[in-house]
Amino acid sequence: MSKIIGIDLGTTNSAVAVLEGGEAKIIPNPEGARTTPSVVGFKNGERQVGEVAKRAAITNPNTISSIKRYMGTNHKETIEGKDYSPQEISAIILQYLKSYAEDYLGETVDKAVITVPAYFNDAQRQATKDAGKIAGLEVERIINEPTAAALAYGMDKTETDQTILVFDLGGGTFDVSILELGDGVFEVHSTAGDNELGGDDFDKKIIDYLVAEFKKDNGVDLSQDKMALQRLKDAAEKAKKDLSGVTSTQISLPFITAGEAGPLHLEVTLTRAKFDELTHDLVERTIAPTRQALKDANLSASDIDQVILVGGSTRIPAVQETIKKELGKEPHKGVNPDEVVAMGAAIQGGVITGDVKDVVLLDVTPLSLGIETMGGVMTPLIERNTTIPTSKSQTFSTAADNQPAVDIHVLQGERPMAKDNKTLGRFQLADIPPAPRGIPQIEVLFDIDKNGIVTVRAKDLGTGKEQNIVIKSSSGLTDEEIEKMVQDAEANAEEDKKNKENAELRNNADQLVFTVDKTLKELEGKIDEEEVKKAEAARDELQEALKGEDFDAIKEKTESLNEIVQNLSVKLYEQAAAEQQAAGGAEGQEAPQNDDVVDAEFEEVNDDDKENK
């Protein structure tokens, strides 16, 4: 069975890992980094992903970051006249991760386990699965990020029973999960979180502060300047990271904008105390979900054996201090918060392929599922924190006499009224025979698979007629749309590959021109004028071809010049060998004059040499 890669598709950064020799290993990207910024840029029809796109963001307005925040919504990004869904942008990132994983492994990769925040709803999970499909990946499993982290942490600790709290504060989402580890079983007891809290929000607090300070000092509002905002965003992220290690950092952005008197510069010293003050409300928002997870698991803080930190934002000292205060224990520092999720996903891939044995993962659904009933009430069928996969049915009836159809409004959430919860979908069970209100028996069955994706079925028990749907939100893509996006992604991948090959061809040709100039200089006066002219003519032809976009011509001229260069190199080698031989001969001639004693053989050679002369 081919390898299944593990992917942490993050808001800010993404990572990919694979199981090798029973151990999960992070695959470095082409730049050598172990995580890749979740940033996509478009420029003149070309796509850039990762660090390259992030660096160019200051000057390229067609740059998209933190797209994960929009998964499962109708959000569209319009770039160069084309609309992109969050699934398509995520697929571009996945495609990049897939491509360098293939380079590392030396084989095609078409299967993956992708992680999502535990608190992602059905629409967001479905969107993630669709993104994988568009990228050419068969998503074997969608796994919750805290659960993946626990897998990576607990793989070598299955001998002892432990209760673990995973505190996952990433770039855009926050989750807390409580798991029980023992005898190779990873059982999730509860999960809670906030899908709109993460490192990006901490950055924004710094940006808002810098904008306010600059306006106060200079009377200029930087929030209206796109390029200045991008520079502020980069500076804020760097300052946040710096303040995890030092108590004060200098933010210096020369020529940030221009005023009436000329260029203006931003110089601000940000202390950790000020940063903590600015972000206090964000840190406080992590407490309620932590308490909720403990309450749902029927545990107190003292029952927790180990606290695992996941996500780069858990490096913020105030966050660590809050966890310590809330749970009464020092968080475990033995895992890399940026890499542990992808590693856990790779381990789950190993469980699927059979490379990892005796490990059972029992995950839960993060939110209650139900339907709208009379009076606009949400009636739950599956309570939150139910172990998945699972299915549950309940029988309902009609609300009016001779009601011909029943509308099934599928909901996800914890609020008592239907309107306050997330609508997953609607469908209708029609052709119900005329009967008094309350007589027809309508069975509604909810089924949640191992990926947390929901199917709902409604059946008229009297007639046996049934209707079912795999839940897709209003933002969900149709199979046709996904197929078209898959084809577009494949075409783009082919184009990207071609562009890369053409860039390499151009670089090699440039290098060859440089080599020819160097070689001709070294051979000056040592080879025929005819040879020199031939090489120069071929070089000039290649330089001319390099001015255009005809890559076949560049290839042809490169090959011709290469052949000439090889012949010249042979001549250069022969020339050097001849000179060395001549030098050796000269030493031999001088030897009899310098030495009093020479052996007969040596003298004989000299005599021959003299005779030859």
Swiss-Prot record:
Region (Disordered): 577-613
Chain intervals with Acidic residues compositional bias: 596-613
Family matches, as PROSITE patterns: HSP70_1, HSP70_2, HSP70_3
Sorted UniProt keywords: ATP-binding, Chaperone, Nucleotide-binding, Phosphoprotein, Stress response
One GO MF term: unfolded protein binding
Phosphothreonine found at: 173
Induction (free text): By stress conditions e.g. heat shock.
Residue ranges the record marks as coiled coil: none
CDD domains for this protein: ASKHA_NBD_HSP70_DnaK-like
Compositional bias ranges of the Low complexity kind: 577-591
PANTHER family given in the database record: HEAT SHOCK PROTEIN 70KDA
HAMAP family: DnaK
Family: Belongs to the heat shock protein 70 family.
Job of this protein: Acts as a chaperone.
The protein's name in its UniProt record: Chaperone protein DnaK
Gene from which the chain derives: dnaK
